[in-house]
Regions:
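Short hydrophobic/aromatic beta-strand element in the GNAT-like acyltransferase core
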Residues: 62-66, 77, 109, 142, ...
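C-terminal "cap" of GNAT-fold acetyltransferases
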Residues: 139-142, 146-153, 157-187
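Active-site acidic-Proline motif in GNAT/NAT acetyltransferases
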Residues: 113-115, 119, 147-148
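A short beta-loop-alpha structural element at the N-terminal edge
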Residues: 1-14, 23-27
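Active-site rim helix/loop that mediates acceptor-substrate recognition in acyltransferases
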Residues: 20-64, 69-70, 74
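Conserved acetyl-CoA pyrophosphate-binding loop and the N-cap/start of the following alpha-helix
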Residues: 116, 120-128
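Conserved GNAT acetyl-CoA-binding A-motif
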Residues: 126, 133-144
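Conserved acyl-donor/pantetheine-binding loop and adjacent beta-alpha core of acyl/acetyltransferases
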Residues: 71-73, 79-109, 171-173
Length: 187
């Protein structure tokens, strides 16, 4: 487990695209003629966003953590960042005994190479993210996950995260019939 370097952002984006891109017809519908260009655009957008976020790494407000296999290929990634969002802050007020500040540690974009899932990599990534959050002075980590992403939900629950809120659904969430869940864990 280590900090991802700036020259690896395209490789990180490729891994995240593999983990998060959804074909137009869904995962069971197969690929369509438009999936190639849409996937390429999706990966380009992920890479561009990563490069913007990476500028905050030097400030201790963003950390892309990566895990490699024995040959140096990326097999897992998690992003840790310092965030502030009014909906999350509102939900945090319900946590008994928590002193709410105006920022929180946020875990995001975690993915594991498809052939390596269910092998403990997600747990290692989560723990590394929590360690960075502690170094930054936080005692709570937050994250969002889609309710229908059972593998991720189970991994987060196994690692001590609990559902805190079910935020409002975006128009795209309604179209895709999905619900985001806000989860939290004291660290």
């Amino acid at each position: 487990m280590r900090f991802g370097e700036s020259d690896e952002l395209d490789a990180i984006a490729a891994l995240q695209t593999d983990g998060f891109y959804e074909p137009v017809m869904g995962t069971r519908g197969g690929l369509t003629a438009v999936d190639g260009p849409l996937r390429a655009y999706f990966e380009s957008d992920v890479a561009s966003t990563l490069k913007k976020k990476y500028a905050y790494a030097k400030l201790g407000r963003f950390a892309p953590l990566v895990m490699e296999d024995e040959n140096g290929a990326l097999i897992g990634v998690i992003e840790v960042s310092v965030q502030r969002d009014s909906e999350v802050m509102r939900a945090m007020r319900t946590i008994e005994g928590l002193t709410v500040t105006d920022e929180y540690a946020y875990l995001s974009c975690m993915c594991v190479e498809s052939t390596r899932r269910r092998s403990g990599i997600a747990t290692t990534l989560i723990r590394a993210g929590e360690s960075i959050a502690k170094e930054w002075g936080f005692n709570l980590t937050m994250l969002h996950v889609y309710e229908n992403n059972r593998g991720a939900m189970e991994a987060y629950e196994r690692n001590g995260f609990a559902t805190l809120d079910r935020p409002w659904r975006t128009p795209m969430d309604v179209v895709k019939n999905q619900q985001k869940i806000l989860m939290a864990k004291r660290i």
